[in-house]
């Protein structure tokens, strides 16, 4: 006879789930309000989203460090808290753009804000867990929402961008699932701290090292796709070009924060175990990404595509710090990305401010360089701010 399973409230510790539940509840409330009354002013949904983000921000600040919850699959540590605050902070900068007079039409859909909050919850699950299954669930929740947000821009190249992103995202998810399956087959666990313990006792086994090699390659490819690292970066410029300028800026920053945190946990585990080839592979990818992305940025005819390649090169810089696997290196990643978040979101916001309804300068691109010629005469303050953002990114 099966013995009953005893579940204690202490092992649940649902307070660790509070930030994600707040975001999910906010998204459901927006959908319910739209079902009850379709004539509500759309600004209400913007303000409601901002309110949910503020509450979410406060709930993260109230979490205790070094705590586990929900049957030990949730992990609240310093990295988890700071990354959640950065994700919510970047979202709070992005959402108020919907209140301006030059907002894009997708900001008129209540579904946009509901999906946005579901995406935030997915990112938070990714950074607040060291359980491979929950990381995968968070990854797919966020990705599926983001694909839809891109398509809501409702232009032919937006649909193309969404399909490209979906295809590449599905491929990355498949690599992640296969890599995780290999790890589970080797160790019998999906919790990274348990995986590390089992691997540490079996590192001398030849067969195990071959399997570790396979799992690490699969996971490296998966996150190279997600972080748009060389040579898996080709989708990023097309997707950024098809998305609205503010959303492209958001995509270049916030989703990558979540992916970098998971990379710190995963590849830090391999490096801590003394598997040095993982470190050197990351460093080689970082150098190639930094170099080739900057070269490609030089030959672009569109400012948005140039900024897309710039974002790719910045990901290479962060991967170099990740390969160090030190407290100082991880601290520098968050400091670097906090500054990068403001400058990159600002640069993409300037593209949005200077947009035109029709392509006046180029039939192919929305933001050709010719569009910004003489900007100092038309919009002096905007030109100065744009210059500051560009110099900051250099």
Which stretches of residues belong to each language-model region?
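Alpha-helical transmembrane segments of multi-pass membrane proteins predominantly involved
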Residues: 1-394
């Amino acid at each position: 006879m099966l013995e009953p399973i005893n579940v204690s409230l202490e092992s649940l510790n649902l307070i660790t789930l509070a930030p994600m539940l707040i975001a999910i509840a906010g998204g459901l409330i927006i959908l319910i309000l739209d079902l009850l009354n379709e004539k509500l002013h759309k600004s209400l949904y913007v303000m409601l989203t901002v309110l949910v983000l503020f509450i979410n921000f406060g709930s993260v600040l109230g979490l205790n460090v070094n705590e586990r919850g929900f049957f030990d699959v949730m992990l609240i540590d310093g990295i988890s808290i700071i990354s959640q605050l950065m994700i919510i902070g970047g979202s709070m900068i992005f959402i108020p753009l919907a209140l301006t007079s030059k907002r894009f039409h997708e900001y008129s859909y209540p579904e946009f804000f509901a999906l946005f909050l579901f995406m935030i919850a997915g990112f938070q699950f990714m950074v607040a867990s060291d359980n491979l299954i929950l990381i995968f669930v968070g990854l797919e929740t966020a990705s599926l929402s983001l694909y839809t947000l891109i398509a809501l821009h409702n232009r032919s190249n937006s649909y193309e961008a969404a399909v490209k992103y979906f295809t590449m995202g599905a491929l990355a998810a498949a690599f992640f699932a296969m890599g995780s399956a290999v790890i589970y087959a080797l160790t019998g666990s999906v919790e990274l701290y348990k995986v590390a313990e089992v691997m540490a006792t079996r590192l001398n086994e030849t067969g195990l090292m071959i399997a570790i090699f396979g799992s690490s390659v699969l996971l490296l490819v998966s996150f190279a796709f997600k972080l748009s690292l060389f040579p898996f970066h080709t989708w990023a410029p097309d997707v950024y070009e098809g998305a609205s300028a503010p959303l492209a800026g958001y995509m270049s920053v916030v989703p990558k924060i979540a992916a970098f945190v998971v990379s710190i946990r995963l590849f830090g585990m391999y490096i801590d175990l003394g598997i040095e080839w993982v470190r050197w592979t990351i460093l080689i990818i970082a150098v190639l990404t930094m170099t080739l992305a900057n070269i490609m940025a030089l030959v672009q005819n569109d400012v948005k595509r140039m900024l897309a390649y710039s974002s790719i090169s910045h990901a290479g810089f962060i991967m170099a710090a990740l390969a160090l696997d030190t407290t100082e290196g991880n601290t520098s990643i968050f400091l670097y990305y906090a500054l990068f978040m403001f400058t990159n979101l600002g640069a993409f916001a300037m593209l949005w401010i200077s947009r035109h309804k029709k392509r006046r300068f180029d039939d192919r691109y929305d933001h050709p360089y010719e569009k910004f010629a003489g900007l100092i005469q038309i919009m002096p303050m905007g030109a100065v701010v744009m210059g500051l953002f560009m110099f900051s990114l250099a």
